[in-house]
């Protein structure tokens, strides 16, 4: 790992539009980033790798089990709802209980945003996998949106694993890469990210340093 990784958990508030310095409309997603707290620091000596664990979101302490209660007490922080670990070579620079906010990022940097996509329910192959479908005419009978063949008959005599078929669509962990942070509002703890990010409004998102690109 060559570069330091920064990250923060937050809540997707929704989309809006702002104007840049050239008076062009820029669609942005507003993310309420943090505040997160550092609950664990992993080092090469004790764990074999370097990483920092951050926590986010309020939770009723009565809903936290005993192992997690002890984990949060060791870091001297109140229990949080979500935990995530970021592997980064500068993990030793973090301290237990340290607060991580939107200020870890600057405007103009590239980030990857991870969230849980919207659930679409049971969907066919045309919606779920972008299949073309069968012909609208020329003798096609009531099979216009079907997948077509899903395998041979006697050879191989089965359906291969991974065959794209109808099924539940969405509600999966999705990462959108190389998005640009348009602006940072440190006072309100907001990140304005150019473009769309996965998930519904109010959903949990992880904003971290881009894995690819500059």
Curated annotation (Swiss-Prot):
GO terms for molecular function: rRNA binding; structural constituent of ribosome. Pfam families: Ribosomal_L3 (PF00297). Keywords: Ribonucleoprotein, Ribosomal protein, RNA-binding, rRNA-binding. Coiled coil: none annotated. GO terms for cellular component: cytosolic large ribosomal subunit. GO terms for biological process: translation. InterPro entries: Ribosomal_uL3 (IPR000597), Ribosomal_uL3_bac/org-type (IPR019927), Ribosomal_uL3_CS (IPR019926), Transl_B-barrel_sf (IPR009000). Residues 133-153 are annotated as: Disordered. The keyword Ribosomal protein applies. Transmembrane segments: none annotated. Belongs to the universal ribosomal protein uL3 family. This is Large ribosomal subunit protein uL3. It comes from Streptomyces griseus subsp. griseus (strain JCM 4626 / CBS 651.72 / NBRC 13350 / KCC S-0626 / ISP 5235). The lineage of its organism: Bacteria, Bacillati, Actinomycetota, Actinomycetes, Kitasatosporales.
